[in-house]
Amino acid sequence: MVGITSFGAYVPRLRLQRKAIVDAHVWADPGLAGKARGERSMCNWDEDPVTMGVEAARACLNSSESAPGGIYFASTSAPFADRQNAGILAGALGLPEEIASVDITASQKAGTGALLQAIGGVGGGLYEEALVVASDKRRTKAASPGELAYGDGAAAMTIGSSETLVDFVAAHSATVDFIDHFRGSGEDFDYTW
């Protein structure tokens, strides 16, 4: 049965205290005061979704004896629009050039989409094992709900059919154009209601 065979994660060490965000903007939006607890992860100047993805994938592949046949990179904030980010990951991880690589972007469903594609690839016999990496460094408007909620980080997992930690039993997808937020091409920030 196809399922998750290993996993890894990377969360940047740098933290942003939510209280610092609220203190800077509470004069304009007093409602922020109730969200001042805790902290969120934040990339340092030399971190981006690809570098975080490499670290998560290294943690994931540590116990793997063979190279995956496919790599899926999912992100809404990939550093390159016209260069394959999954290819950069494959090179940084020392994976063979024959690996199939795919970038899945432009939706917050990119991670689950990549996971389902990898499950389909392994289940359909395209390759024995696939690597899925989801990583984001979301830019947000100052004092927006996103600035308080989003944290930077990456997760990786291998999908295979032997020695699974978690078996894939079923999936259900729904596709509805529900516009609660969006980010247009060329825009830096999400538009939210």
Describe each PLM feature range:
Residues 46-47, 52-57:
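N-terminal low-complexity or amphipathic/hydrophobic leaders
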Residues 1-47, 144-193:
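Condensing-enzyme catalytic core mediating Claisen C-C bond formation in acyl metabolism
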Residues 4-6, 60, 71, 89, ...:
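Buried hydrophobic positions in well-ordered alpha/beta secondary-structure cores of metabolic enzymes
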Residues 1-2, 66-69, 96-99, 124-130, ...:
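Short coil/turn connectors at secondary-structure junctions
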Residues 123-157:
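Flexible, glycine-rich active-site loops centered on histidine and acidic residues
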Residues 31-34, 40-48, 77-129, 135:
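Conserved catalytic cysteine-centered active-site region
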Residues 56-69:
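Phosphate/pyrophosphate-binding loops at sites that engage ATP/ADP/AMP, CoA/4′-phosphopantetheine
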